[in-house]
A protein has these predicted regions:
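STAS-typified acidic loop motif
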Residues: 26-53, 76
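Short, active-site-adjacent cap segments at secondary-structure transitions
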Residues: 77-81, 127-128, 452-453
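Amphipathic alpha-helical interaction surfaces in cytosolic regulatory modules
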Residues: 55, 60, 76-90, 108-111
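Gly/Ser-rich catalytic serine loop of serine hydrolases
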Residues: 120-130
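N-terminal glycine-rich phosphate-binding loop for ADP-containing cofactors
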Residues: 4-12, 16-28, 36, 58, ...
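A short, well-ordered alpha-helical element
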Residues: 45-68
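Conserved catalytic cysteine-centered active-site region
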Residues: 108-120
């Protein structure tokens, strides 16, 4: 075993099987290589050292047959899903990291430098190294049913390291390459459909899935006969490339504030590709060597380990929520009631009817509000139909399931009722008391409260055991987090039903104890509070707002404040200040902002430049103790570390991993920080504040 193979001792090897076939219309044998790790599509083929060597051996066999062409494809539904990342934590030195990059380049470029034409028949998912195999091939076809194509590496903290950064911009142009390598990857890991891949020039042809291989071979025969010559765009290596790199830098700055090394290195490699000549092996050597060096740097970076940790949280822990009771206890939901018909309630109605496909009834204080809520849902369904995502029949069926009533007696046959009204405890208690008069004893009463006590809300009910917190994040259709809060008397059947319903709604549920602010809002308000307190003391708005970009939040604190709404933030802050007065303090500046009914700190001039709203500058009184950006960052980090440890001690969540999951799914915190606790460990903040790390050494770190 080589050093790198030792690191990947547990690799599920993707084998490569060579078959020499006769193809109608092609004179001479064709070598068909199939990538297959021996499992079905739920375990995609990937490349570790073993898989790369298997492909290398398959190419030896193919070339030995003296074919007129070589084609490569994958097992059903999967072409190849990139590098095997399971061995990455075992890579401990730079030589190992360099070896992995060089091995991939050595094997893949055999397709590019082949003296006979090479074809990639992309029959299914092709991501990362999988797509790079296709890019090294001379020609590419894709099945119309291929699930996803893309280069998602920067999303995790890597770069496309087996040719992607050098080949793609020289194939489809630098601007399109920026879209695939950076813009899509950093936009929640967006991928390409086969149709879009064809439009961009990533593939040369798209065929139906039923006879994809046959059509691909027929197309290859026409290429070999000279009847088809795939077009390649002329690449602008001057201003066009300049503009693309400027856009790349803007994307990375906007998404990561340049705090994630992977995307930053990707920009550098895309710039280098300007001078890479795909017809010159020496030029390719230089470009690929730069990829090897970048990959080695990143494989040994804490940010990549944090990214893999975050990826694991989102794809594994989120699917098995800690603290969820046995799912067999969950009751079936066949009808849903929603109290409230405002924007949040209407979004909930849309989600429930779309995902559960059961009757949904809205109620509110007057018919006008109800009609508006039902109309909103119908309008959203019409939009989906207009985009071709729903057939006319399906759209009509969904619209027929949504209704409204002024009378809560209409909820008599519902199994699950959720209130989404103003954050007032007395109002919510009154609503639940009224509902108890009309619904069955086992009907779930859920609350979308963002901070109020579930236990207090249920205290006066005949059946407090069926009350549960079910806190969504806005916009409901976009943010995947759902906090499930157990009140003092919430029973296991109710809790199990809540978790099962969250899964049916395609949301990621995190269980929380019934303490003010629950998980996300408690940390959000603590963070915003530190920034606003710094401004109250005299720190300039611009300094305070930009000081904590390193934390990985997707927007600055005052931009987030405008999105949440100052009044909502103040109300939640007041709830937390009442519960934890030693750590949460109402900002006089925020109170003044709310009193003046101002919606934001920032305003924008005709030139689009962001400035402090003059009225806000006047009403927000400041002291004379200005902090530097470093001081604001330090106090915010320390506040995070302190609050998280207290929450863990209180049992708000089961583990630090759940804190990170909430921040990633509810607030879009960066993968490169693993949420927040890996970052606090990496910067030494955890130990400075709490005397210990949140995560064990080697977890989300080198």
């Amino acid at each position: 075993m080589t050093d790198i193979a030792t690191a990947f001792a547990d690799e599920v090897v993707t084998n490569a099987y060579t078959k020499i076939v006769a193809v109608p219309g092609i004179e001479g044998p064709v070598a068909l290589i199939t990538l297959d790790n021996g499992f079905d599509h739920t375990k995609p083929s990937s490349f570790g050292p073993g898989g790369l060597k298997a492909l290398d051996a398959a190419l030896d066999e193919a070339f030995a047959a003296h074919p007129v062409a070589i084609a490569i494809t994958g097992k059903p539904f999967i072409f190849a899903a990139g590098a095997d990342l399971k061995g990455v934590p075992s890579i401990t030195n730079r030589d190992q990291a360099l070896e992995l990059g060089r091995l991939g380049h050595k094997v893949f470029r055999r397709l590019r430098e082949s003296s006979v034409p090479t074809f990639a028949f992309v029959n299914g998912v092709a991501l990362g190294g999988g797509l790079e195999v296709a890019l090294h091939s001379h020609y590419r076809t894709a099945s119309e049913s291929a699930g996803a194509l893309g280069l998602p590496e920067t999303f995790l903290g890597l770069v496309p390291g087996w040719g992607g950064t050098q080949l793609l911009p020289n194939l489809i142009g630098p601007s399109n390459a920026v879209t695939v390598v950076l813009e899509n990857a950093l936009n929640q890991n967006k991928t390409l459909t086969p149709k879009k891949a064809l439009e961009l020039g990533v593939v040369d042809a798209v065929f139906g899935s039923a006879d994809f291989l046959e059509q691909s071979f027929a197309w290859a025969a026409q290429v070999l006969a000279g009847e088809i010559t795939p077009t390649r765009p002329e690449i602008d290596r001057g201003k066009g490339w300049d503009d693309a790199i400027a856009r790349a830098k803007a994307v990375v700055e906007g998404k990561t504030k340049n705090n994630a090394p992977g995307p930053v290195k990707a920009v550098e490699l895309l710039e280098l590709a300007r001078t890479t000549d795909l017809t010159d092996p020496a030029s390719l050597d230089k470009g690929f060597a730069a990829e090897d060096e970048a990959l080695a740097d990143l494989l040994l970076a804490d940010e990549l380990r944090a990214g893999l940790y975050a990826f694991d949280l989102v794809n594994k822990r989120a699917k098995r929520p800690a603290g969820a009771p046995d799912k067999s206890l969950a009751r079936k939901v066949t009808g849903v009631g929603i109290v409230g018909a405002g924007l949040m309630a209407s979004q909930l109605a849309m989600l429930f009817v779309r995902q559960l496909k059961v009757p949904v009834i809205l109620t509110d204080i007057d018919q006008e509000r109800i009609d508006k809520g039902v109309g909103y849902v119908h309008g959203e369904i019409d939009k989906l139909q207009g985009k071709g995502r729903l057939s006319p029949d399906a759209a009509n069926r969904l619209k027929g399931l949504v209704s409204g009533s002024l009378d809560k007696a209409a909820f008599a046959k519902t199994d699950f009722v959720i209130e989404a009204v103003f954050e007032n405890l007395d109002l919510k208690k009154k609503i639940f008391a009224e509902l108890e008069e009309h619904v069955a004893p086992e009907t779930i009463l859920a609350t979308n409260t963002s901070s109020l006590s579930i236990t207090k809300m249920a205290a006066d009910l005949k059946h407090p055991e069926r009350v549960v917190g079910f806190h969504f994040f806005n916009p409901v259709a976009v943010l995947p987090l759902l906090e499930v809060i157990k009140g003092e008397k919430t029973d296991d059947a109710t809790l199990a039903t809540a978790f099962a319903t969250a899964k049916a709604l395609k949301k990621s549920a995190v269980g929380s104890a019934d303490l003010p602010g629950f998980v996300f809002n408690r940390l959000l308000i603590r963070t915003l509070g530190e920034v606003m307190n710094a401004v109250d003391e005299g720190t300039p708005f611009e300094v305070a707002d930009n000081a904590i970009a390193e934390l990985g939040m997707p927007m600055t604190p005052f931009t987030l404040l405008a999105l949440v709404g100052p009044a909502v933030a103040l109300h939640t802050g007041e709830t937390l200040a009442e519960a934890y007065p030693e750590r949460f303090h109402n900002s006089p500046g925020l109170e003044a902002l709310v009193e003046a009914k101002k919606s934001a700190v920032w305003s924008y001039g005709a030139d689009g430049k962001q400035v402090v709203d003059p009225e806000v500058a006047e009403l927000w009184k400041q002291g004379d103790k200005a902090s530097t950006s470093e001081e604001v960052l330090d106090r915010t980090r320390r506040a995070f570390a302190e609050e998280i440890q207290i929450m863990l001690d209180e049992g708000v969540v089961a583990a630090a991993e759940d804190i990170d999951l909430c921040l990633i799914l509810g607030g879009g915190f960066g993968f490169w920080n693993g949420g927040i606790t890996p970052y606090l460990d990496r910067t030494g903040t955890s130990e400075a504040v709490n005397g210990k790390r949140f995560l064990a050494p080697g977890v989300a770190s080198v």
